[in-house]
Every structure is written in structure tokens, then in C-alpha cells.
Amino acid sequence: MDLSSKPQQQLLNSLPIAGELTVTGEMGVCYKECLKNHAANLGGHALDGCGEFMPSPTATSTDPSSLRCAACGCHRNFHRRDPSENLNFLTAPPISSPSGTESPPSRHVSSPVPCSYYTSAPPHHVILSLSSGFPGPSDQDPTVVRSENSSRGAMRKRTRTKFTPEQKIKMRAFAEKAGWKINGCDEKSVREFCNEVGIERGVLKVWMHNNKYSLLNGKIREIEHGLCLNTHSNDGDGSSSS
């Protein structure tokens, strides 16, 4: 009694035979993602996102022009040719023998799908490298960035203390009396002077350091000018007496 059925026989006939030339490509050759540049006329680079060549149902191996991808519509030549990956062929399901004993399982095991199959395919969307027109970080005006940085630096900069003319006169008199050195002065007198003028000790110390040489040079020039005037007046008195 023949236990084989027609559906099982039809399934066996429809399976591809290992080593047979398929529509996908040559034996042991796979065609991966589509590399056709759809933005070549615009001077850019755009892919359609097709990750693997899918043969069209109407394609025949005798007509090369019919070898178009059913997913993206591009010819097989636009897809990346990968000869390193072999085609995986389906194995027929085990058929019960007439004696009722199960046949041993087939030793043919399909090779696992390589990891490069999942990582090599680009995302399924159009990738455009053309400029979108929106300002990015590199499109910002450098003057605006510099002005922002300068404004932050100005905020961090210490504000200068402004003194009234009366405060300047009193601080100059105190500095001349102390010899332009605050460290050698009596701390009690320094605190009393700072409370009287309305400044802090550190402010007085900085002011004395910044104005020591300028005011001393000005005072020296005043003394020299006075000596010159006295010399001229003495010369005039001597000439008139003679």
C-alpha cells in the first residue's frame, strides 16, 4: 500500500535543489541592499532602503532585463553582490516509510543566518545627504557665539568700586601718613578709618597698591615744579638788587 500522497509529492517537486541556478543569482551568490543613487541628478546621495534583492515572480533566467527586485523595482545589478554567503535551501519534511518505522532525521542542517545580514541592511527610509536648509550647530553665526561668550565673561568680571572725590582725598592723606603700606599700620586705626570713609580694608589695600606710584610720581613732579619756581624767583631778586 502506497502511503505517499499527492500534496507531499508536489511539495518535494517545488523545493529547489542544492547547486541549482536560481533567479536570485549565481550558485552561492546573494544580492544584498540596493545601492542605486536616486539623487545623483541633484548632486546628492539617496538610497531607497531596500535591504535585499527579492526576485520578481515574472523574472526568468533567460531574460536578463526581467531580473528586477520586487521590493524596490531596481535591476539586480544595483544590489550589492555578496559571494561569501551561500544560499540556504529548504529541506523536505520526513516522510513516513511504508513499514511504519520513522526514518532517521536528515543530517543536513541549514547554516545559520550570518550576523552581517541584519547589520548590513540600511534602515528602510530614504537617506538624503543634501543640506536641509535648517541651521545646525555649524551654521550659527560666529559673532553671535562670541557675543554670548563675551557677555558671560562680563558678568563674571568683578565690578570696579567707584569713589567720591572726598573719599579719594581722605584715602590719599591716610596713605601718605602710613607710608603707602597698610600692613605696618595699627589695625584699630585702619578699621576706624575704613568705617569713617565707608569702605572695606581690602578695598583700601587695593586702592593704595594701584595708586601708590602714580600719586607719588605726581607729588614728585609738584615738588620739582615748586623748586623751579623758587629758583626763578631767587634769580629775579638777585638781578634787581644788583
Swiss-Prot record:
A zinc finger (ZF-HD dimerization-type) spans 31-82. Residues 156-213 bind DNA. Expressed in roots, inflorescences, open flowers and seeds. Detected in stems and seedlings. Residues 83-109, 135-161 are annotated as: Disordered. GO terms for biological process: positive regulation of DNA-templated transcription; response to water deprivation. SUPFAM superfamilies: Homeodomain-like. Disruption phenotype: No visible phenotype. Increased sensitivity to salt stress. One of its GO terms (cellular component) is nucleus. It is found in: Nucleus. Transcription factor involved in the up-regulation of several stress-inducible genes. Acts as a transcriptional activator by interacting with MED25 and NAC proteins. Involved in increased drought tolerance. Homo- and heterodimer with other ZFHD proteins. Interacts with HIPP20, HIPP21, HIPP22, HIPP23, HIPP24, HIPP26, HIPP27, HIPP30 and MED25 (via ACID domain). Interacts with NAC019, NAC055 and NAC072 (via NAC binding domain). Binds to ZHD1, ZHD2, ZHD3, ZHD4, ZHD5, ZHD6, ZHD7, ZHD8, ZHD9, ZHD12, ZHD13 and ZHD14. The C-terminus contains the DNA-binding domain (156-218) while the N-terminus contains the transcriptional activation domain (8-82). The homeodomain differs form the typical one by having namely 4 instead of 3 extra amino acids inserted in the loop between helix 1 and helix 2. This is Zinc-finger homeodomain protein 11. The lineage of its organism: Eukaryota, Viridiplantae, Streptophyta, Embryophyta, Tracheophyta. The gene is ZHD11.
